[in-house]
């Protein structure tokens, strides 16, 4: 569960960076 939470946070951060990059 902890691992999934960390991976989820990393995925969310990557999504935010990706969206900013697209903008």
UniProtKB/Swiss-Prot annotation:
Entry keyword Secreted: yes
Q: Any keyword Signal?
A: no
Give the family this protein belongs to, as stated in its UniProt record. Belongs to the Frog skin active peptide (FSAP) family. Septenin subfamily.
Q: Where in the cell is it found?
A: Secreted
As for what it does, the entry says: May act as an antimicrobial peptide.
Name the record gives this protein: Septenin 2a
Give the signal peptide range: none
Please, which domain of life does this record's source organism belong to? Answer: Eukaryota
Quote a single Gene Ontology cellular component term: extracellular region
Q: Which UniProt keywords apply?
A: Secreted
Question: Where expressed (tissues)?
Answer: Expressed in skin glands.
What is this organism's lineage?
Eukaryota, Metazoa, Chordata, Craniata, Vertebrata
């Amino acid at each position: 569960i902890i691992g999934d939470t960390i991976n989820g946070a990393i995925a969310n951060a990557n999504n935010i960076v990706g969206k900013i990059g697209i903008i």
